[in-house]
Regions:
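Hydrophobic faces of well-ordered beta-strands that scaffold small-molecule active sites
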Residues: 16-20, 52-54, 84-86, 114-118, ...
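N-terminal beta1-alpha1-beta2 module of alpha/beta enzyme domains
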Residues: 1-82
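A conserved active-site cap/scaffold subdomain adjacent to cofactor or substrate pockets
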Residues: 179-197
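Flexible, glycine-rich active-site loops centered on histidine and acidic residues
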Residues: 13-30, 92-156
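Active-site mouth loops of central-metabolism enzymes
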Residues: 20-35, 89-96, 167-175, 276-284
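Acidic (Asp/Glu)-rich catalytic clusters
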Residues: 11, 45, 72-80, 103, ...
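Conserved, mostly hydrophobic/aromatic
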Residues: 16, 44, 48, 56, ...
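An alpha-helical appendage that flanks or caps ligand/catalytic pockets
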Residues: 4-6, 130, 136-161, 201-301, ...
Length: 341
């Protein structure tokens, strides 16, 4: 595993990182959510988290970040040591050359700190996915492996008509299926599995490790930590309501806890129920640490990316703080970034 020195690892050698979807709390604006992202990134940097990845979603009332590449620059500028990247860029929407140019620029500005996580999912509904296409008369072509190969070539050597080599970010393949594991293994790429989407992915990670000579595995989980198990479960009501609504075809801002509890009660949803096909780790610091270690062991992962969605930003900060303290991670010295003239 690449050692970027951003945190001291736990006894089980698990690196901790952040996955941020820039959730929009009810009563706040998308701009507020994006400013929360920068604030949380600075806090995560001070706590010693290894990476800060920004997710891509389109047409969602609950998630503010449609362009991770736009947020990576401000986040990297506002932090000192933490690696910053996309979690991920949904490559089928874009030109590989444009993605290479964008992330090559970011890597030049913040050398040694930029990650390019690549995904294949639409990140939105079919209707919005169509709106993202430049030529809407044609059905999108599913040529993801070819796109990924072209993208990597831009970081390898100069090509005809492109007289320079882009500065290279660290490229990761993201996924939640067996196919993504196959591609990651074939291409020899680091692989991050979205357990928060598909908690049955241990076999995919096992395949990847068994077929990739230099495997590097991370797992992204949903987690909420508080001082007590009961308080963490209470805070999780917001994301559980949002998921119930999402599964019904409605994207809503993250509701306040009291509103979410009332909704779940009216709908007859048990207090601890998570929608089928999802897993949310909740609990006190000790409980969450045990769950994280168990999931990391399931996946054979040396790194865990933590996604925390709650209504109150202070509670979200506190969740990451409690987890960092429980694992005993500490910030390292700053990595040089954009020089000031």
């Amino acid at each position: 595993m690449h050692l970027y020195g951003c945190i001291q690892q736990s006894a089980l050698s698990i690196s901790l990182s952040v996955l941020d979807q820039s959730p929009i709390p009810s009563g706040f604006s998308p701009g507020d959510a994006l400013r929360n992202t920068i604030d949380l990134a600075q806090f995560a940097d001070s706590l010693g988290y290894r990476r800060y990845w920004l997710a891509e979603h389109h047409g969602a009332a609950s998630l503010a970040c449609a362009s991770p590449e736009v947020m990576i620059g401000p986040v990297a500028a506002a932090t000192k040591s933490i690696r910053v990247g996309s979690g991920g860029i949904m490559l089928p929407h874009y030109s590989p050359l444009k993605v290479a140019e964008t992330f090559g620029m970011l890597a030049a500005l913040y050398p040694g700190r930029i990650d390019l996580g690549i995904g294949r999912a639409a990140g939105t509904s079919p209707r919005v996915a169509q709106a993202l296409q430049r030529d809407r008369r044609l059905a999108p072509v599913d040529d993801f492996p070819a796109q990924l190969g072209e993208l990597r070539e831009y970081f390898a050597d100069a090509r005809p008509g492109i007289p320079f080599r882009f500065d290279a970010p660290a490229v990761w393949l993201l996924g939640s299926s067996e196919q993504s594991a196959i591609w990651a293994a074939e291409l020899g790429l680091p692989y991050a599995f979205a357990d928060f989407i598909n908690p049955e992915g241990a076999s995919c990670a096992e395949y990847y490790r068994g077929h990739c000579a230099k495997s590097e595995t991370a797992v992204a989980i949903s987690a909420i930590c508080a001082e007590t198990d009961d308080e963490a479960m209470r805070l999780s009501a917001s994301v559980r309501m949002a998921l119930v609504q999402l599964f019904r075809g409605r994207s809503v801002p993250v509701p306040p806890v009291d509103e979410a509890l009332a909704f779940l009660s009216r709908e007859g949803v048990p207090a601890s129920l998570v929608p089928v096909g999802r897993r949310i780790v909740t609990g006190s610091p000790v409980s969450v640490r045990r769950s994280i270690e168990k999931i990391a062991d399931e996946y054979g992962a040396g790194e865990v990316l933590i996604l925390t969605v709650v209504h109150d930003h202070a509670a979200r900060r506190r969740s990451y703080e409690l987890i960092a303290r429980e694992f005993g991670i500490k910030a390292a010295s700053a990595t040089p970034g954009l020089p000031l003239q």
